[in-house]
Amino acid sequence: MIAVIFEVTPNKGSANRYFQIAEQLRNTLECFDGFISIERFQSLVNEGKYLSLSFWRDQKSVERWYALENHRAAQREGRNSLFKDYRIRVGEIIRDYDMAVGR
């Protein structure tokens, strides 16, 4: 399993457009082969900073999503006009357990 951590600080006045694009992409994302889940969080420390945490079956699924044209268009718009700053981290999950499954 792969985790993608996307941290973003939109430019002032751009957050609504960012969330609009994210909502549009979500419909495609939820049907995308290899996608598992996504959640979005707002920082309690850094005003205006958001984090999206998504989980994927494997690296190939992430690469196919990255290459999808409507996702590429959203990335371009983000970099060109919406984002003050962003950072993407991708990592492999080496352990996954919870109270129901145990260790």
What are the roles of these predicted feature ranges?
Residues 78-80:
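Arginine/glycine-rich "motif VI" loop of SF2 helicases in the C-terminal RecA-like domain
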Residues 74:
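Conserved short loop/helix modules at catalytic or binding sites
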Residues 1-50, 59-67, 83-103:
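Short S/T/G/P-rich N-terminal loop/turn motif that feeds into the first structured element of a domain
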